[in-house]
Amino acid sequence: VAGVNLRRVFFVAVGGTVGTAARLALGMLLADAGVVPVLVANAVGAFLLGVLTARLPAATDLRLLLGTGALGGFTTYSAFMTGTLSLWADAPLLACAYAAASLVLGVGGAALGLRAGRPRAGGRA
């Protein structure tokens, strides 16, 4: 296909498969925890995306594999929305708290990841 870099598509697909499988495993481990597995996956994923953003140039194959692929598959907006709507039916206040916590943990995790991933004085992280 003209204009499509199939090697990069492959890296994203492989990473996405691994990330999605990891999220499924997390959900199985915390099966009785309601929306907690999605909250954990999104917060941890945001932190790790922050670290990757600070550490790896945007156009590298490794960043595509780990960031767009693996962490893109590990984190999930659709499950976040499904969980929010599920909570809304019986507990609208809890749904709002979950949505707010997801936003705060996501942005906070990404900011902490960026900070953790940046080299410190002396060139070492």
Which residues fall in each region the model found?
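Membrane-interface helix-loop junctions in multi-pass transporters/channels
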Residues: 1-125
